[in-house]
Swiss-Prot record:
Listed GO MF terms: 16S rRNA (guanine(1207)-N(2))-methyltransferase activity; nucleic acid binding
Cytoplasm listed as a keyword: yes
Gene this protein is translated from: rsmC
Stated role: Specifically methylates the guanine in position 1207 of 16S rRNA in the 30S particle.
Xref: InterPro entries: DNA_methylase_N6_adenine_CS, Mtase_sm_N, rRNA_ssu_MeTfrase_C, RsmC/RlmG, SAM-dependent_MTases_sf, Small_mtfrase_dom
Protein name: Ribosomal RNA small subunit methyltransferase C
Reactions listed under catalytic activity: guanosine(1207) in 16S rRNA + S-adenosyl-L-methionine = N(2)-methylguanosine(1207) in 16S rRNA + S-adenosyl-L-homocysteine + H(+)
A Pfam family it matches: MTS_N
Organism of this sequence: Escherichia coli (strain SMS-3-5 / SECEC)
Subunit record text: Monomer.
Keywords: Cytoplasm, Methyltransferase, rRNA processing, S-adenosyl-L-methionine, Transferase
Disulfide bonds: none
Length: 343
């Protein structure tokens, strides 16, 4: 995280204005500017575990990871710098949470790429902190206002749910496929064999739909789910509970917090981090799977057909199969063999 994002570069044009400020950084924190900007004091709150990992190395306890920020997370801050995400409901959840905690009179800065829809911050905050655009550069907008009224925030009002073949899926803003089962996951589910047994790890679990659908027709599997997203972790826990299915769910940057080996690893890996295209997570998943699969164990993932995963699979496992495909998606399978162990 040495290079700054365009949004951070816009903020740096105003760095002198922040030297005496006690700043809370929040939102889509994709670089380490919160740890490096010269301020009177800096805190950071993120819902993304991998962003917290980077920031906490430099900021210690002043970097926090959780679904909902608390009063302790914003203590003594007189300025909010909020990085607008690509998902408007996610921004609303986070901003209403933060503004309900910060004192009236707090300086509010919102920055983001134009293509992310940052302009809608003006309307969203109109009743609480009227914003004006103060800079435009690097295809980003920077908005400033002052908190005039604290909103009432109730996290429970942001929950949603949908049904898939009789299963209840619980969702929150920022969770992948929040409004329904995506086509890629549907294709992957179609390949899962009933009456499977053993330990299954669902990496990048989202709302937990892959795991609960798998467990319904294979009740003897033992489930572990992980995701970098705090909303996804909470949504998966709620989805498991709603369907009476047991499983361990925790935050992890791919395998960073995963212990032990599994008989199967399933995933619909992300290839976007915020507004940026990133294949890092999927490549880390493929390369790291050999350290978390039992002999004869299987990695099964779905991905957009154009993504360059076959080479990484062959390089890591020695071979791969395409077991299902459509015009847009492919389901890949790779088996843990002696050949893979040498990789």
């Amino acid at each position: 995280m040495s290079a700054f994002t365009p949004a951070s570069e816009v903020l740096l044009r105003h760095s002198d204005d922040f030297e005496q400020s006690r700043i809370l950084f929040a939102g889509d924190l994709q670089d380490d500017l919160p740890a490096r900007l010269d301020t009177a004091a800096s805190r950071a709150h993120t819902q993304q575990f991998h962003h917290w990992q980077v920031l906490s190395r430099q900021m210690g306890d002043n970097a926090r990871f959780s679904l909902v920020a608390t009063a302790n997370d914003v203590a003594d801050c007189d300025t909010l710098i909020y990085y607008w995400p690509k998902n408007k409901p996610e921004a609303q959840f986070q901003l209403m949470n933060l503004l309900s905690l910060l004192p009236v009179g707090t300086d509010i800065f919102v920055v983001g790429e134009n293509r992310s829809g940052v302009r809608s911050a003006e309307q969203m905050l109109a009743d609480y902190a009227p914003l004006n655009k103060v800079d435009s550069a690097r295809r980003c907008g920077l908005y400033f206002g002052r908190l005039e009224k604290q909103p009432v925030f109730d996290a429970n009002k942001f929950w949603g749910e949908y049904n898939v073949d009789g299963l209840t899926v619980k969702t929150l803003p920022g969770v992948f496929s929040r409004d329904g089962l995506d086509v890629g996951s549907q294709l992957l589910l179609s390949t899962l064999t009933p009456h499977t047994k053993g330990k299954v790890l669902d990496v990048g679990c989202g709302a937990g739909v892959l795991s609960v659908a798998f467990a319904r027709h294979s009740p003897k599997i033992r489930l572990t789910l992980c995701d970098v997203s705090a909303p996804a972790v909470e949504a998966s826990r709620a989805t498991l509970a709603a369907n009476g299915i047991e499983g361990e769910v925790f935050a992890s940057n791919v395998f960073s917090e995963v212990k032990g080996r599994f008989d199967m690893i399933i995933s619909n890996p992300p290839f976007h981090d915020g507004m940026q295209t990133s294949l890092d997570a999927a490549q880390t998943l493929i390369r790291g799977a050999v350290r978390h699969l039992n002999s004869g164990g299987e990695l099964r993932i779905v991905a957009n057909a154009f993504l360059p995963y076959p080479d990484v699979l062959d390089e890591t496992f020695g071979f791969h199969e395409v077991i299902a495909q459509t015009g847009r998606f492919k389901v890949y399978r790779a088996i843990m063999t002696r050949q893979a162990k040498k990789g």
